[in-house]
């Protein structure tokens, strides 16, 4: 359900933003994109969703706390917008999970592995510790 506005010439800002992020996700799904680009698109999608919730959804929730019948500047109902956003985000998250699994499988097939620290050998642990101490920590404030 797309929230109704007083003037239907306008598109709901939040749903439009989610449509843009859907296009980012579609780039991650495209098998003709290089694998490293597909990983980047997954990261961009994830970062965008984090910001969307921190800013857009939080603002809608605050508006709803102030006035349960509040509307946006263009007349979209805040409650209806939140309902529509929740439904769309659920769809996008399912699609993201499938894309993530597909990209990670493609990485394994390309012999690219991302290890967490519990999978490191002793030599890898020593290398990572030494690298951090001498190359990274010196640049941290």
Predicted regions and their residues:
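N-terminal localization/anchoring segments of enzymes in phospholipid and broader phosphate metabolism
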Residues: 1-141
């Amino acid at each position: 359900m797309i929230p109704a506005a007083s003037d239907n010439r306008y598109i709901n800002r939040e749903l439009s933003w989610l449509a843009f992020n859907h296009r980012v996700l579609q780039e991650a799904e495209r098998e003709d994109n290089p694998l490293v680009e597909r990983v980047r698109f997954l990261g961009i999608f994830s970062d965008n969703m984090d910001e969307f919730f921190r800013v857009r959804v939080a603002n809608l929730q605050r508006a709803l706390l102030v006035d349960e019948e509040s509307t946006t500047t263009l007349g979209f109902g805040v409650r209806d917008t939140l309902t529509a956003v929740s439904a769309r985000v659920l769809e996008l998250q399912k699609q993201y999970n499938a894309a993530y699994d597909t990209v990670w499988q493609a990485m394994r097939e390309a012999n690219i592995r991302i290890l967490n620290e519990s999978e490191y050998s002793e030599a890898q642990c020593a290398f990572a510790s030494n690298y951090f101490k001498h190359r990274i920590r010196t640049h941290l404030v």
